C-alpha cells in the first residue's frame, strides 16, 4: 500500500497536542478588524479545539488515520 500523503494546507492550519486534541486558529482575524472590539480581537488570538464532529476528517487530511 502506498504511503499516505499529508494534505499540506491542513498541516499548516492544524496542530495535534500530546493529549490528541487538534488545535486550530480562529477565523475573522485577517482583515476588517477596525470595527471589532479589542477584547474580541484578543480572544481570537487564542487557539481553539477542533470539534469532535470534524476530528476524524482532519486526522485523515493529516495522514494520521
UniProtKB/Swiss-Prot annotation:
Transmembrane segments: none annotated. GO terms for biological process: translation. GO terms for molecular function: structural constituent of ribosome. It comes from the Bacteria. Gene3D superfamilies: 4.10.410.60. One of its GO terms (cellular component) is cytosolic large ribosomal subunit. It holds the Pfam family Ribosomal_L35p. Keywords: Ribonucleoprotein, Ribosomal protein. The keyword Thylakoid does not apply. Belongs to the bacterial ribosomal protein bL35 family. This is Large ribosomal subunit protein bL35. The lineage of its organism: Bacteria, Thermotogati, Thermotogota, Thermotogae, Thermotogales.
